[in-house]
Amino acid sequence: MALELADYERKARESVMAFWGNREKARQKQQESGKPDQGERRRDRRKNMDGFCALVIDIIRANGLHRAEIHQKRALLTLPGYFRPTKLWDLLVIQDRRLVAALEFKSQVGPSFGNNFNNRTEEAIGTAHDLWTAYREGAFGQSPRPFVGWLMLVEDAPESNQRRADTSPHFRCSRSSRAHPTYGGMTSSASGSSRSSFTPRPRSSPRRAPPPRQGRIPSPRI
């Protein structure tokens, strides 16, 4: 049966606009409070990605999981791990006491694309490996393999498209890491279904110094 994508292209465009709009509102609020360099708080980052959470929920509902429990409240987002005691996710889908899906929603804007790429890569791979090890060891009971998703919104900026000049004095870097820009090659990961979605910063916004169940949401055309 074909996957029902619930008009995802239109909703993705709206989610991108809401992302930048929420960031701008938070920036203005910080300036008014006299703390312009405070940076994004966790609750602000989560709010910025609310549109994408809603889009994923629409897709879940449109594909038959009408009875599923979809959790977004912090108190209900913790899963057991293996190498660490627990992991706090952004969205969990549970039906009949079985874990159906666990998803993370991340964003990356400038300026430190290179360093943050490494951090995000380690986070995605580590999170996935931890969850799958916990699953293998029976942390989630006798349930089918869950869907594990990692959705990342990346600012389409010159810095995020630059090819890295990494060198390794002892061994050759892999061809795939040399062939792709900083974020250009991040289209899949050990999380199972992971897509990077490039989005340009709106011109009106001031610029700051940017094996699981198969299935993926194509990157929207912005």
UniProtKB/Swiss-Prot annotation:
Q: Which Pfam families match?
A: XhoI (PF04555)
* Gene Ontology MF term list: DNA binding; type II site-specific deoxyribonuclease activity
Query: Per its record, how is this protein called by name?
Result: Type II restriction enzyme AbrI
Q: Where is the composition biased (Basic and acidic residues)?
A: 22-42
User: Which GO terms are recorded in the biological process aspect for this UniProt protein?
Assistant: DNA restriction-modification system
Q: Composition bias, kind Low complexity: at what positions?
A: 188-202
Q: Write out the ranges of the annotated region (Disordered).
A: 21-45, 161-222
Which organism does this sequence originate in? Azospirillum brasilense
Q: Which UniProt keywords apply?
A: Endonuclease, Hydrolase, Nuclease, Restriction system
Class in the EC hierarchy, top level:
hydrolase
Q: Which family does it belong to?
A: Belongs to the XhoI type II restriction endonuclease family.
